[in-house]
Swiss-Prot record:
It holds the Pfam family Ribosomal_L23. Signal peptide: none annotated. The gene is rplW. Part of the 50S ribosomal subunit. Contacts protein L29, and trigger factor when it is bound to the ribosome. This is Large ribosomal subunit protein uL23. Keywords: Ribonucleoprotein, Ribosomal protein, RNA-binding, rRNA-binding. It comes from the Bacteria. PANTHER family: 60S RIBOSOMAL PROTEIN L23A (PTHR11620). It comes from Ralstonia nicotianae (strain ATCC BAA-1114 / GMI1000) (Ralstonia solanacearum). One of the early assembly proteins it binds 23S rRNA. One of the proteins that surrounds the polypeptide exit tunnel on the outside of the ribosome. Forms the main docking site for trigger factor binding to the ribosome. Belongs to the universal ribosomal protein uL23 family. One of its GO terms (biological process) is translation.
Amino acid sequence: MTQVAKNDHRLMQVLLSPVVSEKATLVADKNEQVVFEVARDANKGEVKAAVELLFKVEVESVQILNQKGKQKRFGRFMGRRDHVKKAYVSLKPGQEINFEAEAK
């Protein structure tokens, strides 16, 4: 595998936001995974290092998917929503990320 960049400034820019949706909540309850929207140029190693740095938890694995933006019509013009890269982060047993507690 490639060497993971340990630049803290870069790791702070990898995670854009947590994904809060019905599917993300179902996955979190069933598989103990957390879903994040990540930078388009991020890789699995950077996502793992960023989650461990920001939330002080141990990560077991990371799965990444690229979601293409949908075609949308704006009046008579066709447009496209932005492409999104998501990361499904599996935490080690006993680990948990509580977003409500982190915000306080």
